[in-house]
C-alpha cells in the first residue's frame, strides 16, 4: 500500500504534505483496524478519520493521496456492510483520480503516470456500478457509466468510452428508452472517432430498431358513433346541434401515430447507416439482410409514382439526394458525388458531413485508401 501510494504521488498535482507525513497518519489510522486480543476494532471511527484525512488532502490538492483515503473509507464501509456508503466513497475516489489525470495532462501536456490514475478511476467506478446494481439502483449505475464514458472520451479514448456508453444504454432501456437511445448515439459517435466504422454501423442499426420498437404506437380507431337518439317529447331537453358537439365525437379518420423525439433518432440512424454502407461497401456475400434492404430503398427501381413511401421519416428532399448519392457511388461518378455533397451539406450534421467526405475520398482512392 505504501509503495503504491508513493508511486501515485509522483503524478499528483499541487503542493501538499510530504509522502512521509501522509503515510504516517495513514498508518496511524490503519493500526486502529488491526485485531487485538479482547478488543474489537472501531471500524466506524477509522472510516471517519480516513474521510477527514482525505478532505484535508483534497483541499491541499494532493489528489492521489486523497483518493487512496477514499478507497480506505470504502473498505471500512464494506466491513460495516454499508453498501451505499461504500459506493459513494468509491465514486469520490474515482473522481479524484480523474482530476489527477486531467490536471497532469493539462500541466505536463502528456498522459499522467502512463494512465495509471485513469485505470484506477475506471476500476473504482466499475466497482461502484456493481454495488448500485446489487442495491437495485440501475439508474445510479447508468449515471456512473455515462460519467466514466464522458471522461474517457474527453481524455482521448473514444473506443473505451463507447463500451461504457453502451452499458449505460442497456441499463436505461427498460425505464428510459429515449435516454438509452441518446447513450447509444454517443457510443456510435465514439466509434466513429475511433474509426471503427463497422461497429458504428452495428450501433446505428440497433438504434434504429429500438427507436421503431419504443417510439411507434399503434393507431387506435375511434369507436363508432352512437345510434341516433329518439325524438324528444314535449318538455324534454333538446339535443345539442352537430356544430356544438366535441370535435372528437364524430367518426373522423384516425391520424397517424406521432413518434415525437424518436423520429429524429430514426432520421439520424437512417442517414448515417446509408453513408456508412457507402463507405464500407461490403461485398454481397457479407451484406446483412437489413443492410441490403436499406440500400434497396434507394435504388431507382424502388421509386414509385406515389412519391417516397419507403423513405420513412426522411424529408423528401433528403431522401431524393440520398437516392442520387447511392446511385452515383455505385457508378463511381466522382463529379456527381461532389455536386451532391454541396447540396446535402446544409441538411446533414457535422458527423454525417464527415462521413460524406470520407465516401468521396474512398471513391477517389478506393480499396480503403480513402479511409
UniProtKB/Swiss-Prot annotation:
Alphabetized UniProt keyword annotations: Acetylation, Cytoplasm, Endosome, Nucleus
Q: What is its main location?
A: cytoplasm
Q: Please give the residue positions where the record annotates the modification N-acetylalanine.
A: 2
**Region labeled Disordered — which residues?**
213-250
**Quick one: a GO biological-process term for this protein?**
vesicle cytoskeletal trafficking
Where in the sequence does UniProt note compositional bias of the Low complexity kind? 236-250
Please state where this protein is localized.
Cytoplasm; Nucleus; Early endosome; Nucleus, Nuclear body
Instruction: Note the SS bond partners.
Output: none
Tissue-wise expression: Produced abundantly in a wide variety of cell types.
**Keyword Ubl conjugation tagged:** no
Q: Where does motif Nuclear localization signal map?
A: 34-36
Pro residues: bias regions: 221-235
Superkingdom of the organism of origin: Eukaryota
Q: Which PANTHER family match?
A: 40-KDA HUNTINGTIN-ASSOCIATED PROTEIN, FACTOR VIII-ASSOCIATED GENE 1
Q: Which disease is it linked to?
A: Up-regulated in brain tissue from patients affected by Huntington's disease (at protein level). In a Huntington's disease mouse model overexpression of F8A1/F8A2/F8A3 impairs proteasome activity leading to the accumulation of mutant HTT and causes defective mitochondrial functions.
The role this protein plays is: RAB5A effector molecule that is involved in vesicular trafficking of early endosomes. Mediates the recruitment of HTT by RAB5A onto early endosomes. The HTT-F8A1/F8A2/F8A3-RAB5A complex stimulates early endosomal interaction with actin filaments and inhibits interaction with microtubules, leading to the reduction of endosome motility.
The name this protein carries in UniProt is: 40-kDa huntingtin-associated protein
Q: Gene encoding it?
A: F8A1
Amino acid at each position: 500500500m505504501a509503495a503504491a501510494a508513493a508511486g501515485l504521488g509522483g503524478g499528483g498535482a499541487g503542493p501538499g504534505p510530504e509522502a512521509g507525513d501522509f503515510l504516517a497518519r495513514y498508518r496511524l489510522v490503519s493500526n486502529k483496524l488491526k485485531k487485538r486480543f479482547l478488543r474489537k476494532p472501531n471500524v466506524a471511527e477509522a472510516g471517519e478519520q480516513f474521510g477527514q484525512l482525505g478532505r484535508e488532502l483534497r483541499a491541499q490538492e494532493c489528489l492521489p493521496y486523497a483518493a487512496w483515503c477514499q478507497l480506505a473509507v470504502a473498505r471500512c464501509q464494506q466491513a460495516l456492510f454499508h453498501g451505499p456508503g461504500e459506493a459513494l466513497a468509491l465514486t469520490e475516489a474515482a473522481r479524484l483520480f480523474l482530476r489527477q489525470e486531467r490536471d497532469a495532462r493539462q500541466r505536463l501536456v502528456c498522459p499522467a503516470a502512463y494512465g495509471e490514475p485513469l485505470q484506477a478511476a475506471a476500476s473504482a467506478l466499475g466497482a461502484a456500478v456493481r454495488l448500485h446494481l446489487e442495491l437495485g439502483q440501475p439508474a445510479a449505475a447508468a449515471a456512473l457509466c455515462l460519467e466514466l464514458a464522458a471522461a474517457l472520451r474527453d481524455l482521448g479514448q473514444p473506443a473505451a468510452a463507447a463500451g461504457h456508453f453502451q452499458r449505460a444504454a442497456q441499463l436505461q432501456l427498460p425505464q428510459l428508452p429515449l435516454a438509452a437511445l441518446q447513450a447509444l448515439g454517443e457510443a456510435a459517435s465514439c466509434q466513429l472517432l475511433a474509426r471503427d466504422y463497422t461497429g458504428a454501423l452495428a450501433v446505428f442499426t440497433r438504434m434504429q430498431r429500438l427507436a421503431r420498437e419504443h417510439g411507434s404506437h399503434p393507431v387506435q380507431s375511434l369507436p363508432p358513433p352512437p345510434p341516433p337518439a329518439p325524438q324528444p317529447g314535449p318538455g324534454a331537453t333538446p339535443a345539442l346541434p352537430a356544430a356544438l358537439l366535441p370535435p372528437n365525437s364524430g367518426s373522423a379518420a384516425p391520424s397517424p401515430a406521432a413518434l415525437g423525439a424518436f423520429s429524429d433518432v430514426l432520421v439520424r440512424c437512417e442517414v448515417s447507416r446509408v453513408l456508412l454502407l457507402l463507405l464500407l461497401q461490403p461485398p454481397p456475400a457479407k451484406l446483412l439482410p437489413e443492410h441490403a434492404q436499406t440500400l434497396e430503398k434507394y435504388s431507382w427501381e424502388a421509386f414509385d409514382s406515389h412519391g417516397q413511401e419507403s423513405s420513412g421519416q426522411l424529408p423528401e428532399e433528403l431522401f431524393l439526394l440520398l437516392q442520387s448519392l447511392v446511385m452515383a457511388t455505385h457508378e463511381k461518378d466522382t463529379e456527381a458525388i461532389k455536386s451532391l455533397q454541396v447540396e446535402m451539406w446544409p441538411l446533414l450534421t457535422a458527423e454525417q458531413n464527415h462521413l460524406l467526405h470520407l465516401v468521396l475520398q474512398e471513391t477517389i482512392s478506393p480499396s480503403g485508401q480513402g479511409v
